[in-house]
Every structure is written in structure tokens, then in C-alpha cells.
Curated annotation (Swiss-Prot):
ATP-grasp domain ranges (all copies): 133-326
Pathway: Cell wall biogenesis; peptidoglycan biosynthesis
SUPFAM superfamilies: Glutathione synthetase ATP-binding domain-like, PreATP-grasp domain
Annotated binding of Mg(2+) 2, by residue: E294, N296
Family: Belongs to the D-alanine--D-alanine ligase family.
Binding site for ATP: 159-209
Any one biological process term the GO annotation gives: cell wall organization
NCBIfam families: D_ala_D_alaTIGR (TIGR01205), PRK01966.1-3 (NF002527)
Protein name according to UniProt: D-alanine--D-alanine ligase
GO molecular function: ATP binding; D-alanine-D-alanine ligase activity; metal ion binding
Keywords annotated in UniProt: ATP-binding, Cell shape, Cell wall biogenesis/degradation, Cytoplasm, Ligase, Magnesium, Manganese, Metal-binding, Nucleotide-binding, Peptidoglycan synthesis
Amino acid sequence: MNLGVIFGAKSFEHEISIVSAIVLKNVLKQGLKFIFCDANRDFYLIEQKDMRANFFSSGKYKNSKKLSLAKGGFYTHSLFGANKVECDVIINLIHGMDGEDGKIAALFEFYGVKYIGPRLEASALSYNKELTKFLAQKAGVKALDYEMLTRQSEPKFHYPIILKPARLGSSIGVSVVHDDSELAYAKDVAFEFDKDVLVEPFIKGVKEYNLAGCRIDGKIKFSIVEEPKKKEFLDYEQKYLSFSNENKVKEAEISEELKQKLKFNFSKIYDCGFDGAIIRCDFFVIDDEVYLNEINPNPGSLANYLFEDFESTLNALANSLPKEREIKIDYKFINSITSVKGSGKL
């Protein structure tokens, strides 16, 4: 199977997406087609040998073949016409805006392109942190209390609190606030990236666990459970470095009971429309209860480091994607009206 990877795009997480794509190139043994979307939303076909960070930061990518998106996939163009880039399935590896907000999913659906990634509705629900709270409630999964903050309003929670832009990942614009003296700056940072800011109580020392998975042939394939290294929280630079990880992580040393609880809650989230995607859910465990922290619909490097057999999982998912319902357009209704009217003026 020929797999393609689309990455980059007009997003605050553009550079993290580049790192994710480079990692995927190094992790997967099979050849991949790399499709770069730059900040102007122009598409380029990138050679494997050019998949280096400075190839993009220097602007050299502009010398690559330019692509257009049309029915069935991406195309190069020459004096002799258009040639389709041979990709059976394209992996959506765009982080943040354009990739996780549903834009690229909508384009792929419209043009009939098979892809690995969240569908439009799932993208919208997981991209916006407030909508994710509604999704968790609907799924019967616990989540922390929250409030939405405006520039003029003050948080009602007791300190410490955490401020998060509603539509960003990778810890961009996120701040932990311990007292009034830190609040104004944290608000300025968060509102620089989004007009909507979510506030949650910050629970120091809470247990955190990450679990990824996807549905293959009707059954969810789970990754191992990871317990991330403890810091107050992972900032952008630490997330950037974690996305460049090509090594498998150590499985969390937890009870079988807790492992099953995490899988049960993951399944309830995944069943809310994430078929066709590898997602990662980040959970808190408080007083033996599992709480959803956030959904990563396009996790860094597709969370390859959490799977013992990532390449076979990816290929199996590519063969188990949701199928769009076929709709036959036969114009029977119009023909029946015109035949009755007899004038043909409709």
C-alpha cells in the first residue's frame, strides 16, 4: 500500500507538524509520499532525502514540485498534463489549525481522498476544549470542572489554576497561575492565541496517563499506557522534543484494574466518531476515578512510540477506514416534473 503524509499548514503548530513527519519517515520502513502544506496553503511534493527541518525553514521546499488537490488526490502538473501522486491513503499529520479543526478532513471528503485522521465532526469536537467537555459528558466520561474566561472577567476557581487557549495544542499559550500577581500576564499570553480561554483548577501531583488507539475491523487496538515524566506541566519546548521521540516508551506500572478503566474510558471517547483515526487520550486519575484531560486527534508522530507494532497497526487501519455512503444521482425527480409539465422550462 502507498501511504502519503500531509503536514505543515497555516497553524501555530506548523513546526511541530514538520518534526512529526520527519519522525514518521525515520520510524516507518516503507516508503512514504510527503506532501507539505506551507503557511500560504500551497502544496508541495517533498522527496524523502529532503525531509530535514532546515529544508523547510530555509524556504528550499519552494523548489519542490507544486501540487494541486482535486478529485481522488494530489496532482503534479507539466506541459504534458496532470499526473496523480500515487497514494492509496494519506495520513493527516497536520497539528492544530487546518489539520485538527476539520478543514483538511472536509477537503478530503469532498474530493474523495482516503485518509487516516479524525473526520469532520470529530475534529470539531476535539479541537475546541470546551466542546471536548461536552463530548466527555455525552460519552459518560468524567472531566475536570472548568469555566470560560473573557479579557474582562476574573476566574472563580481558587489558585492554583491553569489557563488554556480553547483551540490550541502542544501547550502553546498555556500557563499555570499561582496567585493574582501572575494572572494578568497569563491572560495576555492565552488571549494572544485565541479569543476563547478555558480555566481549570490545577491539581499538583495528579497522576497522568496517556493511551492511544484506533479501531481496526470493528475492534479497538490499544497502545500501551504511558505515564509521562512528571513536571508541573509540559511546555511547548518539551512537547516539541517529545514529538521528536523515535524510541518506544516504558509501559506504566499500574494495576490491571486501572489499565482496564483507562481502556474503557478511551473506548467511550473513541466511539463518539473517531473511526479512521489514531487518537491519544490524556487522562488524570484522582481518588481512583479516571478523568479525561484532553483528546489528541492527531497526536505527535501519531503516538508511534506507544505501539509495539506501529507499522502493522497503521497499515491495518489504512485497510479498515470508514466508507462514504454511495449516493446515486439519476434526476428522476426533475425528469418526472418536466414530463408532467411538458414545457421543459424548469
